[in-house]
Each structure stands twice: as C-alpha cells, then as structure tokens.
Amino acid sequence: MECFGRLMAGLAPWLSLPDDNTTEGTHRKQLREWALKSYVNAVDPKSPDYLLWRQEGQTLVDAAYIAESFLRGYDALWTPLDSLTKQRYINEFTQLRRVDPSYSNWLLFSATVESFLRKAGAPSDTYRISSSLRKIEEWYVGDGWYSDGPNFAFDYYNSFVIHPMYIESLEIITEAGKHKNIWNMPGCDYQKAITRAQRFGMILERLISPEGTLPVVGRSITYRTGSLQTLALLAWRKWLPKELTNGQIRAGMTAVIERMFGNDRNFNEKGFLTLGFNGSQPGISDYYTNNGSLYMASLAFLPLGLPADDPFWTDAAQPWTSKKAWDGDDFPRDHRCRLGRWTCESGCGPAPLPGR
C-alpha cells in the first residue's frame, strides 16, 4: 500500500492528461488502464493484490496517499471505477477512523482521507477534518514554515506532507463551504495557505545548489526527490509566485533529478528503488522506512500533468537563484514573508479560488 499510494499520488496528474497519438500518450493510456485495474484489485478481498487495509497505525498514512491520488486525478482515476469498487474504498477509508493519528503531520492524513470522502459524496467526519486543520494552522511558525507537531524540525516534511495536504484539504472544504457554513476553523484560509506555500517554494528553490543538489538534512531523507513536492505542486497548479519563472523551476528541478537519478546507483537489479539517498545506503534509513516508503520520490513529477505545449515546458531554461548567485550574475534579494494581510515582502500573493 505504501508503494502504490505514493507512486499514484505522484503520477495522478500525468495519468489524467487526455489521450493522444504520441508515443508517450500511448504509453500513458496503457499505464492508466493498469492503474485502474490495480485500484480495483487493491480493495477486492478475493484478489491476491488486496492491500493491508485493516492493519493499525501506518495504514492511515499509506491510505492517505491513495486518497490524495484520487483528489489529484479524480476524473481519470476515481470516476471510471465501478460502483462496487467505489463503495469498497469508501468502506476502507471510513474504517480508518479507528486509528488515532499522532500529534504531528499525521493529522493531515486523517484530514486528507476525510476530505476525499466529502468530495466523493460519502459521509465524512467533519470534526476530524476541522480539528486537524486548526492544529496545523496553530503550528505555522512563519516565513512559509510549519512545525511538525509542537516542536519545529528542520527537515523536508513541509514538502513531503504539510503544505500539499493542508492546501488540498482546505480546497475541498472551501468548495463545500460555498453551500453551507459548517466549518469552525478560525485562521484557516485556502488562499493564505497557498501564499505560505509560495514562500516556502521560494526558499526551496534557493536551496538547490548550482550543481543541482539539495542539503541532506532531516529525517526521511531516503524519500529523495520527494523533497521537491511543494515546488512541483506550485508548478502543476499554476501557483508559482512572480519571483519564480517556469524556466528556472524546470531547470532547477531537472538538475536535482538528473543529479539523483543520472547514475545507476538508485535501483536494484529488479528495478526497484534502493534504501538510501543516492545509492544503496541502508544505514540512513529510519525505523519506519521500507522500500515502499521510497516512492515518495515520485511526488516531484506532478508537473508531468501539464500538457506538452504548456509554458512550463516550452519556456526557455533559466538559471535558478543559487546558480546565478555563484556564477556572479544578478539575483533577487530575499526577505521574510509577512502574512498578516496575505502579502509577502518577497512579492508572493494569494492565488485565485480554487482550481488549476
């Protein structure tokens, strides 16, 4: 479940592109058909591919990424499923209320599952959504960063989980709130959350070195390019702030991906990711890490959901900030983000409500 959910959460936008006659389009159509069959088998108790839905704890984490894949590819991956399969997912997601999430980013796993149930028209637990999002709002520490629980940690969980799932859950309840006021979430605001993510994206872009590396800090570093997810989300959803151009983000992210995967160290003889950061380095794995965990790396590929003629792909490549700085070229100054009025000293601002 861990491997499947994380992989699909990263690939859902690409699989949602319309069919075409290109080689890539043909390949994508085949993979989408296989994905849909996999979704069916994943909740069929009679299938050998039936996933471990009824386990404790970690199942909530892994199921949240499956729910996120449905949110990101609703029309292509959820809508085509037959009614029995949909009901099985609703039942399995509902069963996850037995899991008491830890006081950390895990709250967003509950919120994501329940937000998907609401989008799908199934009964959802309003309290599990609102209490989780209120707590995430309380944990905002400033300048685009949230703490992961009561204490701040300098790691990539703002990109692995917090910014994306907070925004995606807020998007669902913002849409629901248009019809009736059922939410008690002072301070939680969809546009403000996007503005914070824009600021975090600006910082993340500056962390990309001229050589295409990122600082190796924090836990779960084996998730590799999953650290780029917030930038990937901003690019895919057309939320990049004015300081970040399509050309520089594409070039910077590509540099990191090529530096990471441009060798043959990261896959074993069967083609699966190895435990490690850049190669087989099992000693850096955390106690909760297994080979399925590593497919968080696919979350960097969200921009593949943009069509080939999108400016993200067609704009000329440009140097990213650190490359300009270390090459002696002009580059913009950096300032902290003030969000009292949803503005940022660096210039990022609220995005349109809601949508692509």
Language-model features, listed with the residues they occupy:
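N-terminal domain-start signal
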Residues: 1-23
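Short amphipathic alpha-helical coiled-coil/interface segments
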Residues: 35, 197, 201, 253-257
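Terminal, non-catalytic domain-edge segments
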Residues: 13, 17, 230-356
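Aromatic-lined, polymer-binding surfaces characteristic
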Residues: 11-14, 28-194, 206-232, 238
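Structured alpha-helical bundle/scaffold domains in large eukaryotic membrane-trafficking regulators
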Residues: 19-23, 78, 177, 309-316
